[in-house]
Amino acid sequence: MAGLALLGPIENLLLASTITQLHHRLESVKFLPDAQAPGHDPLNYGVVTAEAVALPEIAAPHRNRTYCLTVTSKPDLPGEPSLWSAAVDALAAGSDIGRSRNGIELLGPPDPSAARLIVVSAGNVDDYTDDYRQTCDLSPIEDPGQAWNVLTVGASTQLTDPPSDPSFVGWQVLGEDGDISPHSRTGMIAGGERWPIKPDICMEGGNVLADQHGDFEPSHPLLSLRTTHIRDDSALGSANATSAAAAQAARLAAMAMARYPSYWPETVRGLMTHSAEWTPKMRSEIRVESGLKKRRRLLTRFGWGIPDERQLLSSSGNAVTMVVQDEFVPFTGDTYRMRNFRLHQLPWPREALLDLGAADVELRVTLSYFIEPSAGRRGWRNRYAYASHGLRFDLQRPNETTSEFTRRVNREAAVNEDGGASGSSAANWTVGPEQRDKGSLHQDIWSGDGPELAATGGVLAVHAVGGWWKNNNRKDRIGLPIRYALLVSLRTRAEDVDLYTPIATSLAVPIEAAPVEV
């Protein structure tokens, strides 16, 4: 996995005649005890993780890092917070932690300058069956992959060429091209719809061979990823499943950090899902489902797809991404009474959109931030009792003034906090607000034509909803700013349209909105 995290799959590099320039390095920490030593107490997994995270930071405190965690365990309650996932959430948010009888102990408020991007594997299935999809869907993501603040990585596969080895005559490749890997767990049965959609993305995890007698070969080199050998630096080996997928995702995240050194961990996490694409196989299933809840269920199998390295590291003429990093105080007043907003004027070229006519256009929006988990396990089964706060985004409707927009957003936020359904329109969105507003990474895709998009006001709101900070009236959290990354991209399949140039000449300036009383 070290080779995958550093180089990615190595075949193309071996065939290339050019020198590969690396812009990131590896660090490693021994996480598991020796085979002869007693294992860690599961109640201490969070503390052990915190100690492992601290070691490289002490040695070299000023490096930007991506943490890759591929050690997982069976969840007690799939999808719901655990001591381990809460500890990982706290570490990602920049909180120091200890352990108490009732859960984790937060040793102070989160420090945004200490925030961390943690990549976690979704975990691997226990057994293989011919109906690999059902097996994957009935195998819930392992702990701590359900953590809100991490980037959870499942495995897909495009390795479908059967081996020519005579010993495998009659064997068939199990997974279809572009489908979920037979190795991967999913979030299909993850505790209902209160919790985040997981996994967030997929990466190549290899395939499995099956014969007619119910036997399976899960690790054939041709259906795995070629990489450096686990023990011999001069030899090649192979890796597969969700650990290999997570290592590749960590590599992409590290490359993004090197390419954009000013980006926060929250931003890079958002960029990973924002640049992800579904394979034709995945897309055919997502698009055929008309119900938003059904689409959400498919997301719990594939996430947002496979990150595109080119899109991750650059924009093109007909696909351009705007990245905003901002912070604000979500609530003010002694009782968190005043809700605050950020409004962003989107710099899309109205004329270019109108010129598109009936041509398809996509507006992709990603909102990424980190929550502070509640220290005590009591109330964790309520998502508003687990997270310190939440953020939401909403797009101004056609013919809606800015003041009407802010009043509507505030009204719907209050209803949402009370457990009511969001009044935001789901029209044209892939999953809609009811499905996307879970966790701390919110993404959705608006699809339509250029004139439809041009008719909106071009203003996007980011607003807060309450969590345990507000519910518990925590005086020591009043006035704390929270930060977020907002990524917005316009894409069109029209080849003769240049969206990049007119957008690049314009800047998105946040409009300060007055606080609105809750």
Q: Where are the predicted features?
A:
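Subtilisin-like serine protease catalytic core
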Residues: 1-44, 62-67, 79, 112-115, ...
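Substrate-binding/access-modulating region of protease and related hydrolase catalytic domains
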Residues: 31-147, 157-160, 234-240, 244-246
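Hard-cation-handling environments
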Residues: 248, 265-266, 274-278, 282, ...
